[in-house]
Amino acid sequence: MSSITSRVSSRSSHELTEKKSGVTNDFKNSFEVGEVKRLPDAEGTADAVAQELLADDDFTYTAKEARRVLWKIDLVMMPVMCITYMIQYLDKTALSYAALYGMKTDTHIDGHTYSSMTTLFYAGYLVAQYPAAILMQKCRLSYFIFCNVFLWSAMVCLMAACRNGPSLLGLRFLAGIFEASITPAFINITAMWYRREEQPMRTLCWYAFNGIAQIIGSILSYGLGHIHGKVASWRYVFIVIGLMSLGWGVVFVFIPSNPSKARFLSSREKRIALERVRDNRTGLENKQFKWKHAYEAFLDPQVIMITLFTGVCMITNGIGVFSTLIIKGLGYNELHSAVLNMPLGAIEVAAMFISGVLCKVFKNGRLLIGVFMNCLTLAGCLMIWKIPDSNPYGRLVGVWFTMWVPASSALLLSLISSNVAGYTKKTVTSATVFVFYSVGNIVSPQLFKSGQTPEYIEGIQAMIVSLCIIIAIAFVLTGYYIYENKRRDRLLAEDPSLGESIKNEEFMDLTDRQQPKFRYRW
């Protein structure tokens, strides 16, 4: 049976640095766009438990063992991330279901206030990003997630008791603060547990549960809409969804923070789990916040482009909040609107599945697959805009087609897992990306103004412009990755000593810019 052997060099970082005469020792003063360098000493060491597991240089394991470890990781980690992502999306969009059943009338809010609820949610999301990034690095990741799930679930439950707009606005802001860390945390988890070629499918998988949430949310909304009692149906929406989320959060008390601490793996399986991700060169957890790595994140061209892509792309999210109202405006009642919202979730899931299959076929091409999904969404927007009022069915199909774009967002997030190395840099990158994610989501609902009902044409036109911009950014980012990989190949050909290894350098919390052998996936 074929075996896989861990091959590491025991040469010291001091020896290797002396051979790299062209490399400067001062990171901040020497940083240039595109520069690849190694610091004179490793920036840090791997997690202490990981170092102990990695002590045996002659460790070997079989492909069958690797598959079994992957299966065990999938069995534990994927359901947790998928269901949590579904729950957080249900909590986030409960507002749109509640709006169908009289929430706006009972709480005396107008269309502007309703739009502001989405804006304030993402304002909370925005202000929490950098504090959450630092706390995420300092605290045990699983406990940190548990606390946030518990707190945002409580906010959702409390919305059922609201009797006016200001109370709803305040709770939405707090819910945004507590939900802010979930996607950045899942990006880090995916990077720590999975090989780079496995990451797109896993990211698409847990992101696809936004679509599952839309289907389940529509079913729940339809069922709760049939309740006619002393408590209004819209209040039951918040109560049921909030309690579901509250109960699920307890799971994170038992989830390991990284592979070296996984109780569901034996000692040998932990070592295999680490060896599987060695070639990622992105490390594990590191509790030390490194300002040099944070500085690098802000100047990295790929981070800038990913950040801009995300902010512009989120303008398309307005359709998620207003889809039920757009469908209702086509002539359907509240219950039928809830049911007809279900295909949006089904198309989102289909988009994730198709993208995942294509990613398995092509080693590179995530960004180009995303471009294809964006083009399908663009077609949906044009259908809503250009199809006449006399053809509501055509417009309905257009609304459904707007849900191809989330696959593009998920593929972009997988690039953070795959292409940003160093725990601080990855954490700061995720926070920065989600600051712009928040800005996009703050702007988006303001483009769907109450005076545009029921078509919201200006909002649809804004989506069309944003889709054209992100398609252009995707092509530029693809070109950058191809150029940077070829440049590194050339540097290694000119100076082979750049490719020599330090023992376990893959787990030493080095950034992608500090590793000449690092190659970007696109």
Swiss-Prot record:
SUPFAM superfamilies linked: MFS general substrate transporter
Protein's GO biological process: dipeptide transmembrane transport
Topological type in the membrane: Multi-pass membrane protein
Residue span of region Disordered: 1-20
Name recorded for this polypeptide: Uncharacterized transporter C757.13
GO cellular component: endoplasmic reticulum; membrane
Organism: Schizosaccharomyces pombe (strain 972 / ATCC 24843)
Source species taxonomy: Eukaryota, Fungi, Dikarya, Ascomycota, Taphrinomycotina
Family to which the UniProt record says this protein belongs: Belongs to the major facilitator superfamily. Allantoate permease family.
